[in-house]
């Protein structure tokens, strides 16, 4: 049995050797040559390089002053977020422009309504004329006539139905040397009333009412634009405020890093003195201190940029005292995260977003235009009615001398002469007795029309344009609603992501702190080296900064969520009324 086992083992070894002998030999690895150009010249030998300032050396120099440009650090200005928002709304130039636009819209509406104020017009003049005599009944070569005219009128539009009313009161005093004029001076007076009522075009909507309705909508438009700008400014203030909070706290973290690095440097020196570390390990610690000191200046620059951004929003002008002050945010970094579902956020956004209000106002203006241009397509047919009462008076002409016989020149005692004198008596005296006793009335009722021969192409085109404009506004609203939906969904997701980042950043900071302390203990016990300690120290500083960044980013995400829901003003207790 043992012999058979040996034979089988020998056979297997021989078979394996034959199979191995049949396999092709593996290629041997050859080193990859360094790159050369087509002439075989390696990069380090390419061409002569001209010397440029070959003797430059970076010499030691004084460290720049640790301060912010143009800021007196002794002039501290504590500032809350609410205080910054109030300053921005009061001083921001864009807000002031929006506020002025609202006032302008108010005056535009007031001016548009002025069309319904009654208009009192009149004229008063004296005229003297001399003309040649062309009448066979007068022997004078010329006739001189003096006229004194005083006319007044009161006209107005009725707010409804496009009605126009007018009242006139005319007066005239005429003096002449014409011998055939019965009266000199002659007094003429009249009192008239007229009404023009559109029956088709202009009855439901006329230019005056269109102007007023559009002015009303423009006022709402300006108010919505003001709220939109206020929301933008409030959000910008919140973001700038939290950026400054992070920058200042990050500056503190970097200063703590310098302190820890210097403590580690002193600790390493003691270990070198004790013989546990080589002297060269002190160099690494000194480099760490220098790196952290440079990080302090970088953090200070970040503070300066963030502070200037906030000052630019809240300051009224470039010469304000705040530019020389150091802003100190005093609000708590932790902000309560709003608990709102997607459906609730969408309902709030659709109710509060000023963009939708702007679109609605534009739609209302378009509806006014549609009504107006639809009215303009109709034929212009107006009902007109007028009443006029006239009167005449004066004094008999003392120079009356007709060149033809009259009943009084033929027979002064005849009935005809008596009737003529009676008629003359009716003409003398005050003209107003005839005016107010309706002695000489005139009545008129009729219609007037203005019909285009081949249809009003202009009105039809304007009405068609208004219809298309309405369709465009509806399409824009659909796009706005979809964009708002995306904005709200993204804002909610960013808040959730920021919450998770804050949690993970806090865990990372705690663990980095533990790892750093553990690595220091290992170094003291000879179980680690200085480089791992410095690595843990750098990681701890970065974790502290990341935790602060995560907290402020969460605050900014909450501000963006309030903006997306159109709730920034209410959330910060801001009244959007224009003062």
Where are these regions (language model features)?
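Acidic, low-complexity, intrinsically disordered peripheral segments
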Residues: 4-9, 20-48, 128-130, 308, ...
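Bacterial Sec-pathway N-terminal export signals of envelope proteins
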Residues: 22-147, 195-210, 214-216, 241, ...
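Small/polar, glycine/serine/threonine/aspartate-rich low-complexity segments that form flexible
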Residues: 69-76, 124-193, 328-338, 371, ...
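Sec/SRP-type N-terminal targeting helices
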Residues: 97-100, 113, 160-188, 201-224, ...
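Periplasmic alpha-helical coiled-coil/stalk elements that build and connect Gram-negative outer-membrane
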Residues: 112, 224-344, 494, 498, ...
